[in-house]
């Protein structure tokens, strides 16, 4: 998506004060069957500017197929548009030399807040029939910090969502309810193989929410605003 310069430029400039690199816009059709909201780009994504194009992206494509979807059917974005990293020193196991590396990390609440207007803009422009959050960061960006994936994964939630306020210092709730289906992050399977069956079941179950009657008026479980 092409963002208005007056929206994106200040965020990109402010991001320089944080350990963030690159900038990966959301990508996909403007009339998608679902919008996917992830956490943040990784190293691969900031190199090729394609969201979910690394190892987690391969798992996401497999999951989409379980719901009868392809990448071309969905709009993909994230709570933070730049790669969060931290700096650490380690010994190279092959050479024995000390080296400085910059692995991925989870974005902070301040970083999510900084990038919040971009996601607000995308949701406003696309008005997705269903928002699928993958992982806790995207879920909590929309529904508050007290809601966790383990309690809601695979369920249809109908609720207002958080939008950034005009000062960029906090959130307010939309008047309009949206339909959100939380899913485990595709990378979760790399760290906990026992989630494989649950992830498959949740994505197969997504198909029942993709019918035309679910665009914005189908009741789902509700999550209280936090």
Residue ranges and their predicted role:
Residues 1-217:
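A polyanion-binding, active-site-adjacent surface
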Residues 214-226:
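Short, flexible loop/turn segments with low-complexity composition
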């Amino acid at each position: 998506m092409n963002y208005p310069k007056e929206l994106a430029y200040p965020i990109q400039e402010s991001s320089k004060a944080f350990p963030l690199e690159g900038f990966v816009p959301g990508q996909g059709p403007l009339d998608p069957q679902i919008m996917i909201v992830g956490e943040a780009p990784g190293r691969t994504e900031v190199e090729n500017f394609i969201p979910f194009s690394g190892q987690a992206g391969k798992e996401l494509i497999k999951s989409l197929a379980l719901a009868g979807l392809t990448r071309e059917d969905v709009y993909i974005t994230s709570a933070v548009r730049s790669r969060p990293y931290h700096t650490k020193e380690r010994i190279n196991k092959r050479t024995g030399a000390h080296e400085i590396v910059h692995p991925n990390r989870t974005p902070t609440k301040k970083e999510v807040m900084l990038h919040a207007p971009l996601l607000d803009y995308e949701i406003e422009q696309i008005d997705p029939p269903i928002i699928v959050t993958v992982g806790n960061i995207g879920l909590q960006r929309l529904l508050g910090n007290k809601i966790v994936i383990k309690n809601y994964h695979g369920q249809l939630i109908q609720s207002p969502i958080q939008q950034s306020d005009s000062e960029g210092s906090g959130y307010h709730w939309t008047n309009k309810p949206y339909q959100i289906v939380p899913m485990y992050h595709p990378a979760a399977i790399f760290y906990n193989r026992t989630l494989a069956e649950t992830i498959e079941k949740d994505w197969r179950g997504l198909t029942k929410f993709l019918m035309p009657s679910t665009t914005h008026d189908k009741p789902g479980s509700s999550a209280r605003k936090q």
